[in-house]
A protein has these predicted regions:
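Outer membrane beta-barrel
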Residues: 74-245, 261-266, 270-276, 308-323, ...
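Bacterial N-terminal signal peptides
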Residues: 4-17
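N-terminal periplasmic/intermembrane-space "pro-region" immediately following the signal or transit peptide
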Residues: 21-105
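Outer-membrane beta-barrel proteins
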Residues: 99-103, 158-160, 192-195, 244-248, ...
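Outer-membrane beta-barrel "beta-signal"
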Residues: 397-399, 422-435
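Detector for outer-membrane/organellar transmembrane beta-barrel domains
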Residues: 267-385
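Transmembrane beta-strand segments that form the barrel wall of outer-membrane beta-barrel proteins
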Residues: 144-155, 237-241, 282-292, 365-378, ...
Length: 435
């Protein structure tokens, strides 16, 4: 900023000769204007200093508040320094349903009951799912820990005041670039897929009709191989704990001899090609274990094949096929039969299911699926099921990004040995709030 003396000197040097002829009053006017400008500049500087001090005070107050808030959060945490970040997820699901006379009084029958009962309708929230997801710390070798834990209220009874919490799926994944070790509870390794439904969530859709679904403890290894940018192989192997069940058609005196859980050994090899919108996956698999009952060993042997075919983003075809013997330990129907000679024989079974999905719009999708399990009649005791066939169709509409309405109609057609075919219709209207 120029002082008055400096300004006058510069003015004198820069003026031409005619200027010097100006009167003293003219020079005085210039000096007065310079005084005014200097005063205004000082005023501006004072205002700038005041604003700067104000900002410093505000920042200090903000930091104090943030530090106090951080201290409060630290006090509210109990040992969280060793825990993993947790995310709450799940689905609040309301179902209104209507059943036929052969539902067996179940909300979501998986087969048609042998004996008729009064048809009934109702509503329920017991298929609501609560979940926790976490992404954890780094592991040696560039790995990462993650996991999931899902529960529902399908245990207990259908009474609204007796819907008990239970574990559905719970896994811990130790992931590296091309390798994953998983420990927890999940579907069988050989049967990762299932139909899309909001009507049947408490148990997997098509249970006992081609879908091996039983959530059970297991340890699995997965190795990933890449053959190109969008082509590769997922090789999986592990130990799966079977849930052995005693058929109601068998002699009661042998029920106490059944070993309820057994180790099963499974493998699956998924070949894939394509991107998210256009993709094909096909995966053969195997399972073998042994059931101990009536002081005898009954082999369980299964071969499987599952697939996904998505030629465009609006169409999808998925499914599964299995063939083997003594498949009950994976959530299927009867596994063995005890003959009058006290010899135990495995029930030979074949099952399959398939689903077609059409994503008509961003909010609207249609799903049609069907499946069956066929047990060899010569292996089944009188009164047992030889064939259970279920087909269904549903439409789903997103009322909002996280609110889904759905309507589904299905029919179960169950054939009992020595009896007529039984039919049961099921209708379901669902509203799901996803979080």
């Amino acid at each position: 900023m120029l002082t008055k003396v400096t300004a006058v000197c510069l003015l004198a040097l820069g003026l031409s000769r005619p200027v010097f002829s100006q009167t003293n009053p003219d020079i005085q006017k210039v000096l007065d204007r310079l005084d005014t400008l200097e005063a205004e500049n000082r005023k501006l500087l004072d205002e700038i200093h005041e604003l700067r001090n104000e900002l410093i005070e505000r920042n200090t107050e903000g930091l104090d508040v943030q530090e106090n808030r951080t201290a409060e959060l630290d006090q509210s945490k109990v040992g969280t320094s060793q825990k993993l970040p947790i995310t709450l997820t799940g689905m609040l699901l309301f179902n209104a349903f209507d059943n036929g006379k052969h539902s067996g009084t179940a909300q979501d029958p998986t087969s048609a009951a042998l004996n008729a009962a009064p048809a009934f309708s109702g509503a329920s929230l017991r298929q609501t799912v609560l979940g926790l997801k976490f992404n954890g710390p780094d592991l040696p070798g560039g790995g990462k820990a993650s996991g999931q834990f899902y529960m529902d209220f399908f245990a207990g009874t259908s009474s609204p005041l007796n819907n008990l919490l239970r574990i559905r799926i719970a896994t811990v994944d130790l992931n590296w670039k091309n390798f994953t070790l998983t420990l927890g509870q999940d579907k069988p390794i050989i049967s990762p897929r299932e139909p899309t439904s909001l009507a049947q969530v408490g148990v997997s859709p098509l249970t006992g009709a081609g879908n091996l679904w039983d959530w059970a403890p297991q340890v699995r290894l997965q190795q990933r191989f890449s053959f190109g940018e969008n082509t590769g192989l997922l090789a999986q192997a592990g130990v799966y704990q079977t849930a052995e069940s005693y058929p109601g058609t068998q002699p009661v005196e042998y029920s106490g001899t059944l070993e309820r859980v057994r180790p099963g050994y499974q493998g699956r090899f998924e070949f894939f090609h394509g991107s998210e919108n256009r993709r094909i996956e096909i995966a053969p698999g195997f399972h073998f274990s042994t059931t101990h009952v009536a002081r005898q060993s009954v082999p369980s042997q299964i071969v499987s094949l599952d697939w996904l075919f998505r030629p465009t983003s609006v169409f999808e075809f998925t499914g599964e096929f299995f063939h083997g013997q003594n498949v009950a330990g994976l959530g299927a129907r009867q596994g063995f039969d005890i003959l009058p000679s006290e010899m135990v024989v495995p029930v030979h079974s074949q099952g399959e299911w398939a689903q077609i999905s059409v994503f008509a719009a961003a909010r609207l999708s249609f799903h049609a699926y069907a499946g069956e399990q066929h047990d060899r009649a010569s292996d089944v005791a009188p009164g047992g099921v030889t064939r259970n066939f279920v087909y269904a169709g549903n439409l789903m509409y997103k009322l909002a990004p996280n609110v889904v309405a759905a309507f589904e109609a299905s029919q179960a057609r169950t054939q009992y040995l020595g009896s007529l075919l039984r039919l049961n219709n099921h209708y379901d209207l669902a509203l799901a709030y996803l979080f």
